C-alpha cells in the first residue's frame, strides 16, 4: 500500500538514516506521532556515494509500520533495474540523481508509470539548469545541501542561492513541483532554507538527535512559517 500524499504548505521529512535501527519500528511510529509529513529513506549503494545503507526490504518493513508517504531517495548508480522493487515495497516518492541517470526523461516516466511520484536530486556542485528540461516529468526536486553519503554534516550555505534559482524555474514552469532540501537541516537553519524557496525539509540528526521529536518538529514549523511568508510577500511586490 502506497501512503496517502498529504499536502500541507510546508512538509517535514525526517530521515531514518539517523534513527536507531535497533528500534526502527518504534522510531517510525514516534516521528509519525510527532507530526512528520513524510518519512525520508536514504538508499546508498557504496558506489555513487561512499556509504552502503538499505534496500527495498527495509522500505517494505517501514511501509507496514506507517501510513505516511515514504520519500525514498536513491543515491545509487544505474537505479533503473530497481524501480519496480521500490514500487512493490511501498515507496510513495522515488527520487533519482541527475548525475547518475543516463536517460532521465525515461526513468522519471517509468517511476510515474509504477504509481509513484518522481523526484530528481542534484548534488551541491551540480548546476540547476540540468533539471530544467525534465520539470514536466518531475513531481519533486531535491537539492542536496551537503555532499551525500553520510548523515550529521553541516549545511553548505552556498546551496541557498541554488534553491532560489530552482524555485524560480519551478514558478516559471507553472507546475506544482515540490522543492526539497536535504542535508544539515536543523531548527536553527531551516528558516534560511524556507526563505530561499524550499517547501520540503529533510532532517536526520536534526530531529533524531534531539530528545523530543514533537518539540523539535514544532520548532521547525515555527521557524519556517514566517520565513515563507516574507518570501511570498516579496514575490507579490
What kind of feature is each model-predicted range?
Residues 99-101, 123-124, 146-149, 205-208:
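Short, acidic/turn-prone active-site loops that include or flank metal/cofactor-
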Residues 2-95, 100-103, 110, 117-118, ...:
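Conserved N-terminal beta1-alpha1 strand-loop-helix module at the mouth
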Residues 191-192, 200-201, 208-210:
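Catalytic cores of soluble, metal-dependent hydrolases
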Residues 1, 227-237:
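Short, low-complexity, charge-dense intrinsically disordered segments
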Residues 184-196:
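Acidic, divalent-metal-coordinating active-site segment for phosphoryl/phosphodiester hydrolysis
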Residues 91-99, 194-203:
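Short, electropositive alpha-helical surface patch
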Residues 179-184, 202-206:
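Glycine-rich beta-strand-to-loop/alpha-helix junction loops that act as flexible
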Residues 125-127, 186:
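Short acidic loop-to-helix transition motifs that present clustered carboxylates
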Amino acid at each position: 500500500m502506497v501512503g496517502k500524499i498529504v499536502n500541507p504548505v510546508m512538509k517535514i521529512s525526517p530521515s531514518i538514516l539517523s534513527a536507531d535501527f535497533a528500534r526502527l519500528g518504534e522510531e517510525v511510529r514516534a516521528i509519525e506521532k510527532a507530526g512528520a509529513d513524510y518519512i525520508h529513506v536514504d538508499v546508498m549503494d557504496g558506489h555513487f556515494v561512499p556509504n552502503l545503507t538499505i534496500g527495498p526490504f527495509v522500505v517494505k518493513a517501514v511501509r507496514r509500520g506507517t501510513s505516511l508517504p515514504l520519500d525514498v531517495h536513491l543515491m545509487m548508480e544505474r537505479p533503473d533495474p530497481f524501480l519496480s522493487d521500490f514500487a512493490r515495497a511501498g515507496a510513495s516518492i522515488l527520487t533519482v540523481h541527475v548525475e547518475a541517470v543516463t536517460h532521465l526523461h525515461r526513468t522519471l516516466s517509468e517511476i510515474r508509470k509504477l504509481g509513484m511520484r518522481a523526484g530528481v536530486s542534484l548534488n551541491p556542485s551540480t548546476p540547476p539548469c540540468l533539471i530544467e528540461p525534465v520539470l514536466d516529468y518531475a513531481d519533486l526536486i531535491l537539492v542536496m545541501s551537503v555532499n551525500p553519503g553520510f548523515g550529521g554534516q553541516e549545511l553548505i550555505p552556498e546551496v541557498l542561492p541554488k534553491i532560489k534559482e530552482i524555485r524560480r524555474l519551478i514558478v516559471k514552469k507553472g507546475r506544482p513541483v515540490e522543492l526539497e532540501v536535504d542535508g544539515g537541516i536543523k531548527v536553527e537553519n531551516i528558516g534560511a532554507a524556507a526563505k530561499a524557496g524550499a517547501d520540503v525539509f529533510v532532517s536526520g540528526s536534526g530531529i533524531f538527535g534531539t530528545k523530543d521529536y514533537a518539540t523539535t518538529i514544532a520548532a521547525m514549523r515555527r521557524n519556517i512559517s514566517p520565513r515563507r511568508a516574507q518570501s511570498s510577500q516579496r514575490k507579490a511586490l
